[in-house]
Amino acid sequence: MSRTFYDKLWDDHVIYSEEDGTATIYIDRQLLHEVTSPQAFEGLNLAGRPVWRISANLAVSDHNVPTTDRSEGITDPISKLQVDTLDQNCDAFGITQYKMNDTRQGIVHVIGPEQGATLPGMTVVCGDSHTSTHGAFGALAFGIGTSEVEHVLATQTLLMKKSKNMLVKVDGRLQPGSTAKDIVLAVIGKIGTAGGTGYTIEFAGEAIRNLSMEGRMTLCNMAIEAGARASLVAVDETTIEYIQGRPYAPKGAAMLQALQYWRTLHSDPDAKFDAVVELRAEEIAPQVTWGTSPEMVLAISDRVPDPEKERDSNKRSAMERALQYMNLNPNTPISSIAVDKVFIGSCTNSRIEDIRAAAKVIDRLGKKVAANVKLALVVPGSGLVKAQAEREGLDRIFKAAGFEWREPGCSMCLAMNADRLEPGERCASTSNRNFEGRQGNGGRTHLVSPAMAAAAAIEGHFVDVRKIS
């Protein structure tokens, strides 16, 4: 019987199934951070339970850590408590953790793949919705709640029901200037933020195969914004090349054995999907969100939509509210929207390829950050990414142009640390969510690629990076 890639991963991890479809599945890897783990560890302590498989866990603090000078530690008492609590829990249970001053510290969805802790064929969970990122490696990866974090710590299993299968096929080749971020924003714009609800998405097609692992991680990272439980990209030589030699990757004979299995991790040619979505890569222009949901997205050449032209009353109402919050008028050219701040970072776009792309645009433009831009931040996804960028001299390009070059962390993706927007400020952001208040109370977020964010910082407004030669 022909199976999809998701079917294969599911079947390989089911321990027991109930008649109603609820299954007990085995979890190969759990990633932990400081926000969703304290209650889970407290539950273990209260019940007197040990961690079932210590080596299956890897922890890091990322949401609350400062991205400026860390010599004085964390000043916010709540943030400090969460980080200190993770340190104490990992020490007590013997779990490997990259603490704040460890060079390997960074955003959980950056450091997992970077260390080779995310491998093809695994089930990977984390108390974080963007765990779907790890599907780029052919792993079944999804976010879980705090009670489930405790359950995995205690049993290395979860109870869940199988998703339906969706294929998102992107054939053709991207235009220069369009990126994986633009692909996934275009997909969300096409199917909506509920389009993937109940599904695991497999991304396939020529354009997907041509993406680097960094690009694939960006793609899978935002599948959750389409409502999907998880997302996958089939394993190929690009996947294998990225993994080889990393600390957690198999070595020697174990690697040869793993390769035999990994090369089976794809959908069968005649596998049936419950839904199929198709896009042409060459038709995908650089994307910019205009509203307060990732599905409110348009090409850089478009204009802000007019709610009066929307027939659906619910959608029209949502558009009107979004325009009011974003302080935008219908029919405004996207390219004329000025920004106050620029954020290049997050688990979506803070890897070395992202930083190179942004630096390349800045270098080509040869100018400094525009006078109307109050702050332009570059926050590498990990200490190792930061070190690599500095070896390549990328930090000097940013600093010479007037950007701030920061320490790794989640930073301005969410208003959980010192990096945030003030009310009314507008930000070009490479993150994944543009909800009301996401980057700070009253802050206005436009999601874009690293190249688009860099160009907006220099020009002071959104521009089409395809025109930058």
UniProtKB/Swiss-Prot annotation:
<keyword id="KW-0100">Branched-chain amino acid biosynthesis</keyword>
<dbReference type="InterPro" id="IPR036008">
    <property type="entry name" value="Aconitase_4Fe-4S_dom"/>
</dbReference>
<feature type="binding site">
    <location>
        <position position="347"/>
    </location>
    <ligand>
        <name>[4Fe-4S] cluster</name>
    </ligand>
</feature>
<comment type="pathway">
    <text>Amino-acid biosynthesis; L-leucine biosynthesis; L-leucine from 3-methyl-2-oxobutanoate: step 2/4.</text>
</comment>
<keyword id="KW-0004">4Fe-4S</keyword>
<dbReference type="InterPro" id="IPR001030">
    <property type="entry name" value="Acoase/IPM_deHydtase_lsu_aba"/>
</dbReference>
<protein>
    <recommendedName>
        <fullName>3-isopropylmalate dehydratase large subunit</fullName>
        <ecNumber>4.2.1.33</ecNumber>
    </recommendedName>
</protein>
<keyword id="KW-0028">Amino-acid biosynthesis</keyword>
<dbReference type="InterPro" id="IPR004430">
    <property type="entry name" value="3-IsopropMal_deHydase_lsu"/>
</dbReference>
<keyword id="KW-0479">Metal-binding</keyword>
<keyword id="KW-0408">Iron</keyword>
<dbReference type="Pfam" id="PF00330">
    <property type="entry name" value="Aconitase"/>
</dbReference>
<keyword id="KW-0411">Iron-sulfur</keyword>
<feature type="binding site">
    <location>
        <position position="410"/>
    </location>
    <ligand>
        <name>[4Fe-4S] cluster</name>
    </ligand>
</feature>
<dbReference type="GO" id="GO:0003861">
    <property type="term" value="F:3-isopropylmalate dehydratase activity"/>
</dbReference>
<comment type="similarity">
    <text>Belongs to the aconitase/IPM isomerase family. LeuC type 1 subfamily.</text>
</comment>
<keyword id="KW-0432">Leucine biosynthesis</keyword>
<dbReference type="InterPro" id="IPR033941">
    <property type="entry name" value="IPMI_cat"/>
</dbReference>
<dbReference type="GO" id="GO:0046872">
    <property type="term" value="F:metal ion binding"/>
</dbReference>
<dbReference type="InterPro" id="IPR018136">
    <property type="entry name" value="Aconitase_4Fe-4S_BS"/>
</dbReference>
<dbReference type="GO" id="GO:0051539">
    <property type="term" value="F:4 iron, 4 sulfur cluster binding"/>
</dbReference>
<dbReference type="InterPro" id="IPR015931">
    <property type="entry name" value="Acnase/IPM_dHydase_lsu_aba_1/3"/>
</dbReference>
<feature type="binding site">
    <location>
        <position position="413"/>
    </location>
    <ligand>
        <name>[4Fe-4S] cluster</name>
    </ligand>
</feature>
<keyword id="KW-0456">Lyase</keyword>
<dbReference type="InterPro" id="IPR050067">
    <property type="entry name" value="IPM_dehydratase_rel_enz"/>
</dbReference>
<comment type="function">
    <text>Catalyzes the isomerization between 2-isopropylmalate and 3-isopropylmalate, via the formation of 2-isopropylmaleate.</text>
</comment>
<dbReference type="GO" id="GO:0009098">
    <property type="term" value="P:L-leucine biosynthetic process"/>
</dbReference>
<comment type="subunit">
    <text>Heterodimer of LeuC and LeuD.</text>
</comment>
